């Protein structure tokens, strides 16, 4: 088994019902934060972390994803003719970012099933999973932090942060033992527990590095919460066979699958743009004054 994390899976087969009607005919992963699709932020994180190949697990109405990361010859020709060199370079860079593959998840059977769809792509290697609802703004890319942890412990690593106690029922929650600095050893985990039953407020937040042993478990995994094949349930079984660690990553994480989180990300990323920042701040000040009146 290769000990280098080279491949990543990005599940993108969800229906995006929280963003209807915008997602009726387009992938929720293509909704833009400022002027870049959410999925592109995640792919850029993977590339910056050293990932060489990416498999996107798609569903129906996801053709826009493939089109975005493919070449657009007509657009390139038009930009070239109009001498828009910067835009042309930007468009060409998107299609040249990394080797991207696609597979269709024919039925929405859960995150565990989506990961299992990637079995032949992954082979016998450790791999990363990056969820499309989670964008992390960090000095060192979130996935790179986790790969550094994997390189030390050579086993499955879950990306975690603490969440508000009242929100534990939205996440996979861990029972852990503190090992060092930001590293924990996982003792147990539960998918979306009731607040009073949660073992902690340490939540898995959309980033995983997993050993290939998970595929044998997923093959026989019974449906869990919501009647779906839950990745957390399979990881719970994996924890009985090998050590699993959790890494409390640095950075601000945005849940862009939630409308408020999406808006927060849009504002913060807009403020990072030099060409937008000053005027946008003035606009926000006027809105703040309006709200206070």
Predicted regions and their residues:
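Conserved alpha/beta core of the MobA/IspD/sugar-nucleotide pyrophosphorylase nucleotidyltransferase superfamily
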Residues: 3-5, 126, 176, 182-185, ...
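Active-site metal-binding loops of divalent metal-dependent hydrolases
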Residues: 15, 134
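Conserved core of the sugar-phosphate nucleotidyltransferase
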Residues: 137-216, 221, 225
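Short catalytic helix/loop segments, enriched in acidic residues and glycine
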Residues: 25-40
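Short, conserved catalytic or adaptor-binding loops enriched in Gly and charged residues
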Residues: 88-99, 178-183, 237-239
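Conserved N-terminal catalytic core of the sugar/cofactor nucleotidyltransferase
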Residues: 2-10, 18, 36-126, 137
